Amino acid sequence: MPRISQKPHRIAFGDRVRALRSDRGLSQEKLAELSGLHRTYVSSVERGERNIALDNIHQIADALDVPVTELFVTHAI
């Protein structure tokens, strides 16, 4: 499904969360558990559908054991 309605920065953020989660071998369910968020919320963040709150950004960063700034790093291909 195309992600036309999402903002590019939300998509980039979600892609980064997904990449970091996958690199750590975590499921969305486990990341949700570690961050205190619901799995469907984590899924919608990864798809770029959420305008995520700062508190939730910190919870995800803590769950992934990375600094918050690491969630905003993008790598050119």
Language-model segments: residues:
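A detector for short, charged/polar N-terminal pre-domain segments
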Residues: M1-A12
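Short basic helix-loop element that most often maps to the first helix and adjoining turn
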Residues: D15-L34, Q59
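Conserved hydrophobic/aromatic packing and binding residues within compact polymer-binding modules
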Residues: V17, L31-A32, V42-V45, L71
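Recognition helix of helix-turn-helix/homeodomain-like DNA-binding domains
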Residues: G36-R50
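DNA major-groove recognition helix of helix-turn-helix/homeodomain DNA-binding modules
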Residues: N56-E70
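Short amphipathic recognition helices of helix-turn-helix/homeodomain-type DNA-binding modules
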Residues: E70-I77
